[in-house]
Design a protein with these regions (language model features):
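Conserved short alpha-helical segments that host acidic/polar catalytic motifs at enzyme active sites
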Residues: 1-272
Length: 272
């Protein structure tokens, strides 16, 4: 099982420490097949990092600290939405399967295993991208047709600004509580919530989609339960063709993708 941390607001000044603490926690609890985080910068752009190798290793890599406060004391984050993911692979130990999943200018992290009979032509080797596709299309019917179990967070652009979606089904674990930055934190465990400054106060309601437009302002929508039987994996896995799916490629300018390409390359070389 993967672990996720979702925050509607966070301490921009302490972003590097939050990332490093999450890395350490996930490594200690067995989510050591990949790591990633995504947030919005001060210019309103989507920024993200992924682990340079599928296995985390014992110490936080340099890129966990490389995007910290600059010489002027400014943070690269606007202190708003933040997603962090530690991966325990069920299939596909590769960087391509490491979260966040990116597409249509959006970013998603997910815990669980999902299937779909209607998105079988997605040509993806990662089930999380089925959720990304359904959410990017703003299609509740597609989301309702996904079976399995899931808890996810997704940052999505709109004409009015960024939105954060949070949801879980009736099986996956997702707890929540108010955090020290004036927003809310959601996490797989109480310890995950504490990393982003929150003490758990309740469990997230099942089959409900929360959509935040700010650190506290949000709407709720009910997600109908899927009614069809789970689809065999072979109907939606296509390892030979997944790169043809436009959801994975070209949606985010290269300059925004890896802010610290040199650090990532150095770290990957050092771990080989």
């Amino acid at each position: 099982m993967c672990k996720i941390i979702i925050a509607t607001a966070h301490s921009a000044k302490n972003l590097k420490q939050t990332i490093a603490t999450a890395w350490t926690y996930f490594n200690q609890t067995g989510e050591s097949d990949g790591f990633g985080a995504v947030w919005i910068d001060r210019a309103g752009k989507l920024c993200w990092i992924k682990s340079s190798t599928p296995n985390l290793g014992q110490k936080p890599p340099r890129f966990c600290f490389g995007f910290a406060d600059n010489e002027n004391g400014d943070s690269p984050s606007n202190g708003g939405f933040l997603l962090i993911h530690g991966r325990k692979a069920t299939c596909g130990k590769s960087l391509e399967n490491t979260h966040p999943m990116l597409g249509s200018g959006s970013a998603l992290i997910h815990n669980g295993i999902v299937r779909s009979s209607t998105i079988k032509n997605a040509h993806t080797t990662c089930d999380s991208e089925l959720l990304l596709l359904a959410m990017a299309e703003n299609n509740e019917r597609r989301l309702a047709e996904i079976t399995g179990y899931f808890a996810f967070g997704m940052i999505q652009p709109t004409a009015a600004g960024w939105q954060l979606h949070v949801a879980k089904d009736d099986t996956a674990r997702l707890q929540a509580g108010p955090n020290k930055s004036g927003g809310f934190t959601f996490g797989t465990t109480p310890e995950a919530c504490q990393i982003a400054g929150a003490e758990v106060s309740h469990t997230v309601k099942s089959q409900t989609l929360l959509t935040f437009t700010s650190k506290t302002k949000h709407t709720t929508r009910k997600i109908p339960k899927a009614v069809q039987a789970p689809t065999p994996a072979k109907t939606w896995l296509d390892a030979d063709n997944f790169k043809e799916w436009p959801m994975r490629h070209g949606s985010i300018p290269a300059a925004q993708q890896h802010l610290f390409a040199d650090e990532l390359a150095d770290e990957q070389e050092a771990m080989q």
